[in-house]
């Protein structure tokens, strides 16, 4: 087991945590190159958000620690709830109701294989 090399965060992503978690399940425990390929061919909107965070983590690892890309793997992908925007939606007979637009957070931790 390697040590924690790098952590990248995506805060306030315009997708719900449950939708982000569907895509995050695809890349947990995979090598970085395999995870990037999975995200490239995934058609979900959340895959684009997670792909950006993963690329940021890889860039941080290469810039700060001079790590080879082939030795990196995705150890953890943490998905959490961020803020919710509340909007008003007009309804029948002069009434109104609230619409909640949920946002999510993603934290990706990369480890190095020994």
UniProtKB/Swiss-Prot annotation:
**GO MF, one example:** structural constituent of ribosome
GO BP annotations of the record are:
translation
Q: Which GO terms describe its cellular component?
A: cytosolic large ribosomal subunit
Q: Keywords in alphabetical order, please.
A: Ribonucleoprotein, Ribosomal protein, RNA-binding, rRNA-binding
Q: Which SUPFAM superfamilies match?
A: Ribosomal protein L22 (SSF54843)
Cited NCBIfam families: rplV_bact
Any idea what this protein is called?
A: Large ribosomal subunit protein uL22
Gene name per UniProt: rplV
